[in-house]
From Swiss-Prot:
The gene is yidC. The chain crosses the membrane at residues 7-27, 345-365, 415-435, 453-473, 494-514. It comes from Mannheimia succiniciproducens (strain KCTC 0769BP / MBEL55E). It is a multi-pass membrane protein. This is Membrane protein insertase YidC. GO terms for molecular function: membrane insertase activity. It comes from the Bacteria.
Length: 540
């Protein structure tokens, strides 16, 4: 019994430490690297090299202007010099709780750069190290009208007898943006261009601990790897270069992600690079030959918005994996599905968390019952076990043999009280990641003072209630710990957990509180059954 309690204490403390570390890191935004070289403007070093042996030329040094493209979920700012998306404001997401300001994902500030770039390079490319394509537009503001499903925004450039159109296609209610090139070759010679798309981001310093470091950085998917992170530190150490069918590249930022998705039927090259205090992760598509007098359309897509699993999964294979549940994904995914289903019924994420807790505890009830039954049987054997310790003294081998014989005769599994607890730990970790990764919980209210389930309880009421419920649950335990040191540790456990949970998301604390309350109820039901079997007697 003592060894099992020690294992439980150590396991709970270890899990609490890991979760606490991750919470601290997720809510400590990495600071940009201090450098005078980081600029919001394009530089020669930022342009990807073409796989073609020659490169086009640009005769102008024009300045672009910023145009606005808007639907019901975002507003994009696009620079006509190159056609880069230099800002994305998300209509349905506040910058902070109760703020009228919208969350800005892509942005182009001198010390905070996060831009989605794309262009045409190669032999006849219009985006080169000498300069970017200077597009013309019909207006400076484009808005998808109510009732309209789709809006096309063309940026046009005519150069050397070739008409280039960079067309942004936005849809109602979608963060998926088509970015297509329509090329009309009106000359008597064939031309060659190569499309690229890249995400430019200020290099950020790593923070956090070795246990579970924080992460804001790149990620990619290829034919051989469904999903893999590629951090800014890795970019600085080694440039990524992968040839793949289909694939995509992305930059992750907690609840949000931007991703370039090239033509999924083409052979693409994924790459990273660094220059001037900036990190780049992007793709190069295959070289496209446009015959004399002919035309070609080159397709790609840009996602810039929240991590919405279903929607992202429909845009590109494995893009939904950017909702990163870690190793517990196989548990977290069905838990999130259940959470979403319950929320659709009760229309409150706090009530949905309570519903999920009830379902999870209900499913685990047989394990809980087996745990308490095993512990009760072990308590009944304590007098015999103590007698063995006194009889065999230092002869540990003989004592172990006799103990195993006793367990077999009494049909008791000495690990029966521990194994169910170990099974429940991955579920708790999966729930933590579900609550931490679900953008749906960001700024989601419960009731009263809980207006953001993804943030800590501002008045610490839930953690205090959780600590009280844990203290009550401990006091209802039928057997005190024999070892004085272990008893002191167990007495402090509710306080330790309460302190840890002061800074945890309110949603996670709510889960633990409700779980404790349900455990108290289940415990009483189980004890009644054990009393009838003579395996338990109530404390006086």
């Amino acid at each position: 019994m003592d060894s099992r309690r020690s294992l439980l204490v150590l396991a709970l403390l270890f899990i609490s430490f890991l979760v606490y570390e991750q919470w601290q890191m997720d809510y400590n935004t990495p600071k940009p690297v201090a450098t005078e070289q980081a600029q919001a403007v394009s530089s020669n070093a930022e342009m990807p090299a073409s796989t073609s042996s020659t490169e086009g030329t640009v005769d102008n040094v024009a300045q672009g202007k910023i145009i606005s493209i808007q639907n019901d979920v975002f507003t994009l700012k696009v620079d006509t010099l190159g056609g880069d998306v230099v800002e994305s404001s998300l209509t349905n997401y506040a910058a902070e709780l109760n703020s009228d300001a919208r969350f800005i994902l892509l942005q182009n500030k001198p010390n905070e750069v996060y831009v989605a770039q794309s262009g045409l390079i190669g032999k006849n490319g219009i985006d080169t190290k000498a300069g970017r394509a200077a597009y013309q537009v019909e207006a400076e503001q484009f808005t998808l009208a109510d009732g309209q499903n789709e809006l096309r925004v063309p940026l046009t450039l005519e150069k050397d007898g070739v008409i280039y159109r960079k067309v942004f296609v936005i849809k109602a209610g979608s963060y998926d943006i088509e970015v297509n090139y329509e090329i009309q070759n009106q000359t008597n010679e064939a031309i060659e261009v190569q499309p690229y798309g890249q995400l430019k981001h200020t290099l950020v310093q790593s923070s956090g601990s070795m246990a579970m470091p924080t992460y804001t950085g790149g990620a990619y998917s290829s034919a051989d790897t469904n999903y893999k992170k590629y951090s800014f530190d890795e970019m600085k150490d080694k440039n990524l270069s992968i040839d793949t069918k289909a694939g995509w590249v992305a930059v992750l930022q907690h609840y949000f992600v931007s991703a370039w998705i090239p033509n999924q039927d083409a052979d693409n090259q994924l790459y990273t690079s660094t220059a001037n205090g900036l990190g780049f992760i992007g793709y190069r598509g295959p070289v496209v030959n446009v015959p004399a007098g002919g035309s070609e359309t080159i397709k790609s897509a840009l996602w810039t918005g929240p991590k919405l699993q279903n929607e992202m999964g429909a845009v590109a294979n494995h893009l939904d994996l950017t909702v990163d549940y870690g190793w517990a994904w196989f548990i977290a995914k069905p838990l999130f599905w259940l959470l979403n289903v319950i929320q659709s019924i009760v229309s409150n994420w706090g009530l949905a968390i309570i519903g999920v807790t009830i379902v999870v505890k209900g499913i685990l009830y047989p394990l809980t019952k087996a745990q308490y039954t095993s512990m009760a049987k072990m308590r009944m054997l304590q007098p015999k076990l103590q007698e063995m310790r006194e009889r065999f003294g230092d002869d540990r081998q003989r004592m172990s043999q006799e103990m195993m014989k006793l367990y077999k005769e009494e049909k008791v599994n000495p690990l029966g009280g521990c194994l169910p607890l170990l099974i429940q730990m991955p579920i708790f970790i999966a729930l933590y990641w579900t609550f931490m990764e679900a953008v749906e919980l960001r700024h989601a209210p419960f009731f009263g003072w809980i207006q953001d389930l993804s943030a800590q309880d501002p008045y610490y009421i839930l953690p205090i209630l959780m600590g009280a419920s844990m203290f009550l649950l401990q006091k209802m335990s039928p057997t005190p710990v024999a070892d004085p040191m272990q008893q002191k540790i167990m007495n402090f456990m509710p306080l330790i957990f309460m302190v840890f949970f002061l800074w945890f998301p309110a949603g996670l604390v709510l889960y633990w509180l409700v779980s404790n309350i349900i455990t108290i109820v289940q415990q009483q039901l189980i004890y009644r059954g054990l009393e009838k079997k003579g395996l338990h007697s109530r404390k006086k």
